[in-house]
Amino acid sequence: MKKILFVAMQNSPHTIRWILQAQSEEWEVHLFPISQYPLHPDMPSWVKVHHPWKIARASFGSGFLTSPIVTGNILLAYLSSLFNFRQRIPILSSLMLFLVDSFRSSLGVAGNTSPIAYGPFVLSQLIKNLKPDLIQSLEFQHAGYCVYAARGLIDAKLFPKWMGTVWGSDILYYRNIPNHLVQIKQLLSSLDIFSCECKRDIDFARELGFTGVFSPVMPDAGSVDISNLKQWRDLIVPSKRRIILIRGYQSFSGRALTALDALEICQERLHGYRILVYSASNEVKQRVKELSLSTSIDIHILSHITPYAMLRLFARARLFIGISVSDGISRSMIEAMAMGAFPIQTDTSCCEEWIIDGVNGYSVPVDDIEVISEKIQSALANNAMVDNASRMNLALIDERLNNETLTRRALEFYRASLGLC
């Protein structure tokens, strides 16, 4: 039977959604995690996960670092030789992550590293023993770089077909950093298949030297099940909703503080609306506190909200605001559109592949607070635009992101890549 080996962030919901699209009786699905952290709770049981060791817990709360028998499908010949451990070495559970993370491998000229136990050498041993027919790395700067480094440890004639999948800012942002640009070019020149969620990344890949096969453009975060969401979506007409949701990332790419500054400018127009900020960084939390004390804005931080609760909030929101210097298809924007919230998203994502500016959303510059504020006020004033956008976006999401369509396209491409059709 054919084998697909995913190299990916094992705790990411994006990984889960992608792998679910690859389920088939025609091949086995394997996963090499890129770190020592736990699997996402929704990881399918039919995925064979290749950890370099297994962690077992004793009844009294301590843990054990268990050395597997080194066979054709287990990875630890290297670590066994380093640490010379036998069957079980007791170790405090609280120290496990620290110890594993302390020994790191280089992933190349960009300067990224990985835990040595989940690094290129161990991955190369798995590839040699498992002999997958296709490797798919989900994301470039960790998973992709790790596969590229492992590739250098294996005879090129024995290395399997490799599909590299771009996430979010993998090329758009990192191509502006010299060392990353070098490594992105190296990676692209080694790929057989390039996978992305934004059409713009196809052009970037060509410009940077990719000459292989392009997979169908598909969202990294998977499908949206409209049929199960309508029960929440249709409870309140968008123009009657009184919640504004803001994605609270302030990071190398997130710019939630810019969104908050734009709200402060139009605070008089926000009377009667509640502003909710989710996934807030520490500086964003501080800024929200300042706005709450110094202005009339009714603004709050959302903490520890589940994905389903988030969807229900989108169904009660009039506006969604996502500001970032770099992104792919924002999952938050997609979910907002699916639930009827009017999206205001920066043009540094590929939102323009989804939004007709001023029709079913607004595409705004990341650094122009005045423009962002004007678009917020416009979306609050124009009830007809918001309601019409809701209907248009529902049809758009259902057309592009329904599970049946995406799964069929994914399976057809996997079959072709594995030589099954």
Predicted regions and their residues:
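Short alpha-helical donor nucleotide-sugar binding micro-motif in glycosyltransferases
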Residues: 312-317
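Aromatic "clamp/platform" in nucleotide-sugar-dependent glycosyltransferases that forms part
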Residues: 325
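Short hydrophobic beta-strand element within catalytic cores of glycosyltransferases
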Residues: 341-345
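Short acidic/histidine- and often glycine-rich active-site loop of Leloir-type glycosyltransferases
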Residues: 348-358, 362-363
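A short, well-ordered alpha-helix in the C-terminal region of glycosyltransferases
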Residues: 371, 378, 385-400, 406-412, ...
